Regions:
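Membrane-embedded alpha-helical bundles that constitute the cytochrome b-like, heme-associated redox core
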Residues: 2-5, 20-360
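Bacterial N-terminal signal peptides
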Residues: 7-16
């Protein structure tokens, strides 16, 4: 009796289990077959391969928002990036200027195509300032070398008398050498930062070159303010004797006697030195100083945005290249290019014969 009851109970349980499993499978199949309810604005198809190739021909395709584009081309976020690239300002908790702008708006700097400002700055630097600046400096160096090869150091025509005349005071020489040392520091460090990857990086390797450029960049930033202060001192010290005079035109017309071999009368500074003072020291010097102080963020009250820094860098680099080209000639004439010139700035005195021949 008990055995028959147990067999009957097991049969009932087995039938119930089979019925439950059959119902669950049926419900699962029905659920998978039922169409999914798509929320408004959501992606209707995740398979980008199923997108028709003519989706861009739909009316209003170009004006679609990112949500609308996701319906016809899942994964195509062009509308969002188009807004970002147009200079759209988003939200950021950072207090810095332009923190909400991921990409700058399109501009067209001289020498660059119309594109985002960051890319336009890169184009100007890499395709204009670097190659043309290098060509300018190379041309000047080659011209100086050829001139020295043909002319050598310009000698005195008469014998020295031994009588010395003061040409520069101690203060004038101190101002000059302070400015000159700061300028050379800036020029060398600037040239390495601009061109070093072309001729130093392959030799030194990435690690040593990176360490060197870091040191030179630090030296550049510290020498900049020193150059700015000493430049103002130099301008105020020598401006009086660099004012234009009547004999300057005659000096320029005869090329300073550089090719004829005959000296041309001039005041304390000849027309060539005055051109260097007004063009190289005053105009280019102040441009380099102003843009450099802005790049170092040392000018109070300014909003240091990316566009401001980009324009300042381009102006700074271009003016510095021109300034270095001019001062290469000045350094040459003040050292090996003319007999007695370096001694004048080192000791402050020149021989009487030198004074008569060069500055009557």
């Amino acid at each position: 009796m008990k055995k028959s009851f147990a067999v009957a109970l097991m049969s009932v349980l087995l039938c119930a289990s089979v019925w439950a499993q059959t119902k669950a499978v049926g419900a699962s199949v029905a659920a998978s077959a039922a169409p999914a309810v798509v929320a408004p604005g959501s992606i209707q198809d995740q398979n980008i391969l199923s997108v028709k190739p003519d989706a861009d021909l739909e009316p209003g395709y170009a004006a679609q928002s990112n949500g609308e584009r996701a319906k016809v081309q899942p994964g195509n976020n062009a509308p969002m990036w188009r807004q970002v690239g147009s200079g759209l300002t988003g939200y950021s908790s950072l207090p810095t200027p332009e923190a909400g702008n991921l990409i700058q708006a399109a501009v067209q700097y001289p020498g660059a195509t119309k594109t985002t400002a960051g890319e336009a700055w890169r184009q100007v630097r890499n395709s204009r300032i670097i190659p043309y600046g290098a060509a300018l400096l190379l041309i000047v160096v080659v011209a100086i070398a050829l001139f020295y090869w043909r002319k050598g150091s310009l000698p005195l025509h008469g014998a020295e008398t031994g009588r010395r005349i003061e040409r520069f005071t101690a203060f004038e020489r101190s101002a000059h050498w302070t400015n000159a040392i700061a300028f050379c520091t800036l020029a060398i460090s600037g040239l390495v930062m601009a061109f070093g990857k072309f001729f130093l990086l392959p030799v030194l390797g990435a690690t040593l070159f990176g360490f060197l450029t870091y040191l030179l960049k630090t030296a550049h930033n510290f020498a900049g303010p020193l150059f700015a202060v000493s430049l103002v001192v130099v301008i105020l010290t020598f401006v009086k004797d660099n004012l234009p005079r009547g004999e300057d035109l005659a000096w320029l017309a005869r090329g300073g006697g550089l090719f004829s071999g005959k000296e041309v009368a001039s005041h304390r500074f000849n027309a060539g030195e005055k051109l260097l003072f007004w063009g190289g020291v005053f105009v280019l010097g102040l441009i380099v100083v102003g843009s450099g102080l802005l790049l170092d963020k040392l000018l109070p009250g300014l909003l240091y945005e990316r566009a401001t820094m980009q324009v300042s860098h381009m102006v700074h680099a271009a003016a510095a290249m021109l300034m270095m080209a001019m001062f290469l000639g000045h350094i040459y004439m003040g050292t090996i290019g003319m007999q007695g010139a370096y001694k004048a700035m080192r000791t402050g005195y020149v021989d009487e014969t030198w004074a008569k021949e060069h500055h009557e």
